[in-house]
Amino acid sequence: GYTTYNSSINNLACHSYSNGKTNRLTVESSYSSFYCSDFDSDGVNEVMLLSLYTTENDATANMLVYSEERNCLYSKASVKMDPNITRFKNITVTAAENGQNVLIVDGCFANDDTVTQIIYFNTELSVLRNPLFKEKDKNITQRSADIICTDINNDSVTEIPVVDKLPSTSDEDKSAVADKISWNSFYPQSEILNHLSDQIPDYQNGYSFTVPESWADGTYTVRLDSEKRAMSFFEWDSDNLGQKVFEIRAFKLEQWDVGEDSDAYTLIYKNESTAYAFADVNEETSLSISEDDIKTAFSLMTVNNI
């Protein structure tokens, strides 16, 4: 493709090659971004054009297929996308639970919130679908956290994050209340997100903690101490902060090596700049967790991802 005077609009250019000759295909399509993959499970790749909203174009996903007889690309199906997206942040193709390829699109609003849309071709109805986008309802994936869809468990399937604040009282400083990131896979048959696991991120210090499966929603919460560089886990009971369960803290490496304020802590991991350690493990709470499980649940964050 090639750009136009509008940075959000590109014109598509396609060519076919046969018997040593290159021929230009008839294409009358513009786009903001595109991806090629087999979206309708017919063994042949299609071209998925994504368009941001402009005064000239609606926000759409448009699936083009090649006609050898007519020597052109034509639109097989299209679907509306969120017109409030100002730029695409991350686009990837992944296999859904039924093995079908779906397009996962992370985009940004003008306020930099991120939202995920899932574009897939319904083979039974021969229509393109975008089930997470509802014109009058908020997309459940909308998040201020700088987190994009990614494969969190190395199964070659991209997972979708839903971010919420953990429980707190009405008078608490919400900046000290940690997020919970719920990771989900997508089921095209029912168009639902299937919950896989939860993680608690410490964005400032670059790590996360995977919530034990035995911890039920609404029974725990986490507080962040930016000055201490600590993340403390608590019981949560009937809108009240309960007993402390344990704490994870990030130390500067030189601070850790000389034992400054770190005697009570057990090392989880250290790199060239930071030592991560835990302390205050309370074995008398309903959420008690072993030291080995704390170490296993710890993981470093990468850019934009857990």
Where are these regions (language model features)?
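Short loop/turn segments that connect beta-strands within beta-propeller blades
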Residues: 17-20, 67-70, 122-124
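Beta-propeller fold detector
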Residues: 23-29, 74-80, 128-134, 194-198
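Short coil/turn segments at the loop-to-beta-strand junctions that recur within blades
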Residues: 28-34, 79-87, 135-144
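Surface-exposed amphipathic alpha-helical segments
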Residues: 278-306
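Secretory pathway targeting signatures of secreted, lumenal, and periplasmic proteins
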Residues: 212-267
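Acidic/hydrophobic-patterned starts of short beta strands in beta-sheet-rich repeat architectures
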Residues: 1-3, 41-50, 96-107, 152-164
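Beta-propeller blade termini
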Residues: 31-39, 50, 87-96, 144-154
